[in-house]
Regions:
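Divalent metal-binding acidic/histidine catalytic loops
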Residues: 1-132
């Protein structure tokens, strides 16, 4: 009963809250990806986080524990960028269904080595075990 009262109070006090989207004519789809390395002390798995924008408006975000244990920050960031790419491709398809065509998708990643691997995905001894 106490939980129900809290929910009703929350809904009542937040009825004026909302999300504001600008009338930005920029319809460029972009994604920001980040990951922490071995952030979970119990199983040493990393967590990926992604934010997706159309123009200047945030339209989606996600946070997910990665399925595998990364051996480095580069691997964790590369896996996060791959997940971000997958989501962006789905969003590109969805926007295309609404008549908004995207020719280029941009992914922002803060790890130089992960960016270099994505530009040249040749299997090196340090990267051949990575599965996305």
């Amino acid at each position: 009963m106490i939980a129900l009262k809290r929910i009703i109070k929350y809904v009542k006090t937040t009825t004026n809250f909302g999300v504001w989207y600008s009338k930005d004519t920029n319809d460029v789809l972009s994604g920001y990806s980040d990951a922490n390395w071995a952030g979970n002390a119990d199983d040493r798995k990393s967590t990926s986080g992604d934010c997706f924008y159309v123009g200047n408006n945030l339209v989606s975000w996600m946070s997910k524990k990665q399925n595998s244990i990364s051996l480095s920050t580069t691997e964790a960031e590369y896996i996060a960028a791959g997940s971000c790419c997958t989501q962006l491709l789905c969003m590109q398809k969805l926007l295309h269904d609404y008549g908004i065509c995207q020719k280029h998708l941009t992914i922002y990643c803060d790890n130089t080595n992960a960016i270099n691997i994505s530009k040249n995905p040749v299997q090196h001894s340090r990267t051949k075990h990575i599965e996305i």
